[in-house]
């Protein structure tokens, strides 16, 4: 259609060379790309899932790893080398091992690139920096490959803390287990920036003989927020010193 219109217009201009040329009123607007992600399940899709908020985790968050905190959910079985839920722990969902449980933190894959498992011992007390958790049982919504065959575990880290605060918490438990956690936030500053963080230390002798754990962790988050923008930059990590329970127990 546009081809024939062009010919007709050309003929008209050729017959009337003195006619006034009308400028094209069309304008071109270049739009930025839009990225759509589908990590979390909702009620209107056929996926079995459980949502847990920070308030749901708080009564159980006494220093144990995230798999142990999820042990009461349907279809979940957890393991602990030391027997106390601290140190090397594992999770199975509907009989599927950790290599088929896709773990994401803020939508970013966290599974080990070689073994496809997740070493929770490197994230001690990470539950203290989690805003919400969603566990999808069975094939889920993850876009990160075949690791979501068995289940998907989505972790959402701390939301923006608008008020300044500092908090020190300590927990004591069996087998000489001690957890100390320091959390803080600057609140929203003049330009919309916020700095928050967490420092944690966990020590436990473990239920199994010679299964002690000495764990340190940090989490720092910087955010910028205004009416239309939210930018987060975060860094976290941990250091673990564990005894020889990794090698199992001798039959004798």
Region locations from a protein language model:
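Sec/Tat signal peptide C-region and signal peptidase I cleavage site
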Residues: 9-14
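Short, acidic, small-residue-rich periplasmic hinge/interaction motif at the N-terminus
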Residues: 16-59, 98
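Short, glycine-/polar-rich solvent-exposed loops and beta-turns at beta-strand/coil boundaries
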Residues: 27, 76-87, 108, 114, ...
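N-terminal periplasmic accessory domains that precede
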Residues: 33, 66-69, 89-92, 104, ...
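Extracytoplasmic beta-strand/coil segments of soluble accessory domains associated
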Residues: 67, 71-109, 131
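Outer-membrane beta-barrel domain signature
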Residues: 80, 140-144, 170-172, 207-209
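Short acidic/polar hinge/loop motifs at secondary-structure boundaries
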Residues: 109-137, 156
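Transmembrane beta-barrel wall of Gram-negative outer-membrane proteins
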Residues: 165, 172-203, 208-247
């Amino acid at each position: 259609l546009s081809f024939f219109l062009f010919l007709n217009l050309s003929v008209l201009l050729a017959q009337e060379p003195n006619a006034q040329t009308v400028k094209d009123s069309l304008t071109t607007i270049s739009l930025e790309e839009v990225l759509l992600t589908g990590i979390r399940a909702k009620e209107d899709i056929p996926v079995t899932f459980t949502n847990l908020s920070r308030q749901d985790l708080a009564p159980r968050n006494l220093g144990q790893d995230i798999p142990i905190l999820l042990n009461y959910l349907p279809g979940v079985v957890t393991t602990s080398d030391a027997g106390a839920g601290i140190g090397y722990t594992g999770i199975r969902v509907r009989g599927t091992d950790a290599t088929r449980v896709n773990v994401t933190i803020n939508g970013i894959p966290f599974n080990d690139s070689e073994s496809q498992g997740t070493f929770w011992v490197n994230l001690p007390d990470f539950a203290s920096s989690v805003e919400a958790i969603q566990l999808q049982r069975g094939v889920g919504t993850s876009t990160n490959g075949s690791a979501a065959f068995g289940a998907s575990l989505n972790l959402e880290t701390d939301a923006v803390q608008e008020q300044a605060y500092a908090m020190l918490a300590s927990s004591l438990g069996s087998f000489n287990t001690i957890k100390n956690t320091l959390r803080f936030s600057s609140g929203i500053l003049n330009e919309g920036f916020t700095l928050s963080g967490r420092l944690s230390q966990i020590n436990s002798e473990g239920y199994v003989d010679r299964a002690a754990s000495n764990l340190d962790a940090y989490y720092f988050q910087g955010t910028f927020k205004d009416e239309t923008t939210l930018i987060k930059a975060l860094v976290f990590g941990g250091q673990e010193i564990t005894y020889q329970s990794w090698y199992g127990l001798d039959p004798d």
